[in-house]
Amino acid sequence: MANHKSAEKRARQTIKKTERNRFYRTRLKNITKAVREAAANGDKNAANEALKVANKSIHAMVSHGFIKKQTASRRVSRLALLVNKIA
């Protein structure tokens, strides 16, 4: 248990940041999974819609400071390549 006021505040902040990061991490996994599943099923329309949602969500995470801009671009690029491979 924290003995100083500043240490108590840091503990509170850590809890809030942990919850926020867990939310973003889970969301990132879920939207990526949705695109990959749609691509695996060969459904071009569903894959494109999922990619559109993923693109918007991933770049929103950049503005919230969860991931860096280059990381977001790389993830979106790889998902787009996957969707474009669908015949």
Curated annotation (Swiss-Prot):
Q: Which SUPFAM superfamilies does the record match to this protein?
A: Ribosomal protein S20
Keyword terms, alphabetized? Ribonucleoprotein, Ribosomal protein, RNA-binding, rRNA-binding
Task: Tell me any Pfam family this protein matches.
Answer: Ribosomal_S20p
- The lineage's top-level taxon is Bacteria
Residues in a coiled coil are none
Q: Name one GO cellular component term.
A: small ribosomal subunit
Region entry Disordered, spans: 1-20
Record-linked InterPro entries: Ribosomal_bS20, Ribosomal_bS20_sf
Please describe what this protein does: Binds directly to 16S ribosomal RNA.
Instruction: Family membership, please give it.
Output: Belongs to the bacterial ribosomal protein bS20 family.
Protein name (database record): Small ribosomal subunit protein bS20
Q: From which organism does this entry originate? A: Campylobacter jejuni subsp. doylei (strain ATCC BAA-1458 / RM4099 / 269.97)
